[in-house]
Amino acid sequence: MNDSRYIGRFAPTPSGFLHFGSLVAALASWLDARAVNGRWLLRMEDTDPPREMPGARDAILQTLERYGLEWDGEVVFQSQRHEAYAAVVDRLFNMGLAYACTCSRKQLEGYDGIYPGFCRNAGHAREGAAIRLRVPELIYRFSDRVQGAFEQHLGREVGDFVIQRRDGLYAYQLAVVLDDAWQGVTDIVRGADLLDNTPRQLYLQELLGFSQPRYLHIPLIVQPDGHKLGKSYRSPPLEADQATPLLLRALRALGQQADPALIGASPAEVLAVARQQWQPDNIARQMTVPEADLR
């Protein structure tokens, strides 16, 4: 298959080094793009400076290169896109589609993350407040390429959500939608922990007149206690001299062929074979895969 119109992306957060779970996500999105001769973009989701780890940006780029996951074009940094985000927040606020919220975390305790609408009609000034997007009492549905049909009632299951924090930083939901549209992304391949974020992004896409990408949410790699691999759980960083065995393990996590005969091959050779054999239909339709099952 050849689809040069395909544009995928990998968008890590520089809050730490890449780990095995990151590799599985990067590999899935890279293979999905390269298997159809599409483009694969790299975007650094660095909208939250307090969470950034010094040196993580460069380490992420170096790790991807060492593992043979080369990207197209220049790396995009969300920290350089604030003007675009601000313009859209202003637009939504001025249209009455967003409003200022002064609620504290303590006020919102006990609502299970569903905003109860305290500030919806309060008319607060924007200064020092968060900005929330009004959501409709509608069900948003989409078909995920792995997880299948998914739906969410935005009003009941999420409530009005933040697009700009009270400290002025822009929320993930806003930035990801604007950047995917700006970069022309047609296909989003990412972890299943973001599956329930998708309806919020569909709503924003609809409001702003953007095309809807195709979505593929892969199972998360989890530790024995059920927590996903991640920086907050001190998951070990990817080692440069383990690229080939870890790529083969990542292929197994994605339900792909991982020929043991390739153990002595270079990362580029492993990726060349995997690209030809990529079968996204073989990815398990489940939310998690225990890392212990892959050893």
UniProtKB/Swiss-Prot annotation:
E.C. number: 6.1.1.-
Chain ranges for the short sequence motif 'HIGH' region as given in the UniProt record: 12-22
Binding-site list for L-glutamate: R9, F10, A11, P12, T13, E45, Y172, R190
Pfam families listed in its UniProt record: tRNA-synt_1c (PF00749)
Domain of life of the source: Bacteria
Organism: Pseudomonas entomophila (strain L48)
GO cellular component assignments: cytosol
Motif 'KMSKS' region: positions: 228-232
Family: Belongs to the class-I aminoacyl-tRNA synthetase family. GluQ subfamily.
Biological process, per Gene Ontology: glutamyl-tRNA aminoacylation; tRNA modification
Residues that coordinate or bind ATP: K231
HAMAP family: Glu_Q_tRNA_synth
Keyword Lipid metabolism: no
Protein name as annotated: Glutamyl-Q tRNA(Asp) synthetase
Co-factor requirement: Zn(2+)
Gene Ontology terms for molecular function: ATP binding; glutamate-tRNA ligase activity; zinc ion binding
Cofactor: binding details: Binds 1 zinc ion per subunit.
